[in-house]
From Swiss-Prot:
GO biological process, one term: response to oxidative stress
UniProt-listed InterPro entries: FeS-repair_YftE, Hemerythrin-like, RIC_family
The protein's name in its UniProt record: Iron-sulfur cluster repair protein YtfE
Keyword Iron assigned: yes
HAMAP family: RIC_YtfE
Locations listed in the record: Cytoplasm
Length: 220
């Protein structure tokens, strides 16, 4: 099956583990989820046929949960429990680890200087963002008022873009989240945690941008 003309966001939601494949190739399927596979591959100078072949293998497996057809209230409850609660645990721990690594290894050229600052910025942005969703937007959608939520949704999408930009800064700051040979246990654990955060946040944004928001605006 030809996947090249399909949007990345749609592929990430319809094919098991496609999101992990896109992460491997550093392709943005959340904020950039509307771009086609062909366009995304061209921008990264990747062979689209190779990626299509990998997607075809993944597509042979059953998908665990197809959120594209789930009730909006169920999607919202899932987002709060699976992503919002998780981010509230992840970021404070990562900030503590980054503070320690930057202090203890300050003399090493490979230390990710400024990482604590960037993680703190992300934490502050996401905390405010998630609170607005939980207190304003999500109740509107649950009450069947999603079609009137163009304003709040456009603000949330803009904040998603800002979070995505911060993730790019963090990836650049950490050599694409790759620990150097001299990294201590805390350093390695922190990078594992950052990779997990990036995976979770991209899946979180993808589910909102590519499923929840369009369906809410359509009046479901």
């Amino acid at each position: 099956m030809a996947y090249r003309d399909q949007p990345l966001g749609e592929l990430a939601l319809s094919i098991p583990r496609a999101s992990a494949l896109f992460r491997k190739y550093d392709m943005d399927y959340c904020c950039g989820g509307k771009q086609t596979l062909a366009r995304a591959a061209a921008r990264k100078e990747l062979d689209v046929e190779v990626i299509e072949a990998e997607l075809a293998k993944l597509a042979e497996q059953p998908i665990e949960k197809d959120w594209r057809s789930a009730p909006l209230a169920e999607i919202i409850d899932h987002i709060i429990v699976r992503y919002h609660a998780r981010h509230r645990e992840q970021l404070p721990e990562l900030i503590l680890q980054a503070t320690k690594v930057e202090r203890v290894h300050a003399d090493k050229p490979s230390v990710p200087k400024g990482l604590t600052k960037y993680l703190t910025m992300l934490h502050e942005e996401l905390s405010s963002h998630m609170m607005k969703e939980e207190q304003i937007l999500f109740p509107m959608i649950k009450q069947g008022m999603g079609s009137q939520a163009m304003g709040p949704i456009s603000v949330m999408e803009s904040e998603h873009d800002e979070a995505g930009e911060l993730l790019e800064v963090i990836k650049h700051n950490t050599n694409n989240v790759t620990p150097p040979p001299e990294a201590c246990t805390t350093w390695k654990a922190m990078y594992n945690g950052i990779n997990e955060l990036i995976d979770d946040l991209m899946d979180h944004i993808s589910l909102e941008n590519n499923v929840l928001f369009p369906r809410a605006l359509a009046g479901e």
